[in-house]
A protein has these predicted regions:
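Catalytic core of non-heme Fe(II) oxygenases with the double-stranded beta-helix
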Residues: 70-203
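Non-heme Fe(II)/2-oxoglutarate
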Residues: 1-81, 113, 131-137
Length: 203
């Protein structure tokens, strides 16, 4: 996980928010709503920044303006999870650009990697069957509200995983991680109705 400071300036963030103020979402399934980032806006605000970041790049799917009403639990955005026919030889990265900020907006990224939901399920199963002396405890759930992400008991899956980092959403910054890395959102719903961000998946 890598945090990029000064990726956008605050005025650019305001322009993006204003652009989508009365915009209808093309996909709305209740938990979240998506729409593709307008191409003119992308060219104006993001293209050169991505060139600076990667020299050259290929986007797997369009950049997405996303509004989340509920936090995402532990998952990956791997290419094979989105499309089982895809190769994992070049997994690519995800770039998250927050359009809101606050102490309750956090993305937690772990070092463990999974290609699909089945591998995540197996990882949890292996964890449940571990002897007590093999269970790790990073105490991340004491710092970030992750109670929704996995049932809390005597042992906690979120605490057992190897922490890569916690990204507190801050306007103007961005964060990058490998697409097959496990990650989750903190529970912001006790304090906010929703949160907005731009997410882009790269080859």
């Amino acid at each position: 996980m890598k945090i990029i400071e000064n990726f956008l300036d605050v005025n650019e963030v305001k322009q993006i928010k204003e652009h989508y103020k009365n915009h209808s979402f093309t996909c709305n399934i209740g938990d979240y709503a998506n729409t593709e980032v307008d191409q003119k806006l992308f060219n104006k605000m993001l293209h050169e920044k991505f060139i600076t970041l990667f020299d050259s790049y290929k986007i797997t799917q369009a950049s997405i303006y996303q509004r989340c009403y509920l936090p995402f639990g532990i998952h990956t955005d791997s290419k094979t999870r989105m499309d089982p026919t895809r190769s994992v030889d070049t997994e690519g990265v995800a770039v998250l650009i927050p359009l809101d900020e606050g102490e309750h907006f956090n993305t937690v990224v772990w070092k463990e990697k999974c290609a699909n939901n089945e591998e995540i399920t197996q990882l949890i199963t292996d964890f449940v069957n571990l002897p007590n002396d093999k269970v790790q405890n990073s105490n991340i759930t004491e710092e970030v509200d992750l109670d929704f992400a996995w049932e809390k008991g005597e042992r906690n899956f979120c605490n057992h995983l190897t922490l890569d980092g916690v990204y507190n959403w801050k306007l103007g910054t961005a964060v990058i991680w490998e697409r097959n890395q496990l990650h989750a959102s903190s529970d912001f719903t006790k304090h906010h109705k929703y949160k907005d961000a731009i997410t882009t998946f790269f080859e």
